[in-house]
């Protein structure tokens, strides 16, 4: 799954003291929650409750999709849609457990069981992505520079006056 993060310039949310307000704004800034949504609607959304009530409240716990479906009172596809968005941010780790009969069971938890450490992973991915963009921009600049260089026509002895 490709790494995806919305990056926009914003001021730190450190003046805010309400954890739900900070979390709502932060999750909107990084592209996990819809921007500009009504706070009451957001707090009741599956996406928000998955983060707030499950992953952040119990960061070390391994959550199974069936459990999340029951806790969040929603469908399995909805749970997976939000899990996949968090996986794209690289905030989640996926753990497979072998069960009897050979079929594995997947569980999910906040990476490293800690939001700060999980965010370190996100930052590293973002830095790598920006570095690759820089390499592409530099390469594109060189190609454009080469394209602008005047081309010298091949020298020819025809048409020159003889001495």
Positions of the model-derived regions?
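N-terminal leader segment of winged-helix/HTH proteins
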Residues: 1-41
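Alpha-helix N-cap/helix-initiation sites
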Residues: 39-44, 61-62, 76
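Short, cationic-aromatic polyanion-contact patches
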Residues: 43-47, 97-124
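Short, locally clustered residues in the helix-turn-helix/winged-helix DNA-binding domain
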Residues: 51-59
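Short acidic, hydrophobic short linear motifs in intrinsically disordered regions
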Residues: 59-70
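Short amphipathic alpha-helical interaction segments
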Residues: 73-88
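A short, conserved structural fragment
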Residues: 87-99
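Amphipathic alpha-helical dimerization/coiled-coil segments
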Residues: 116-163
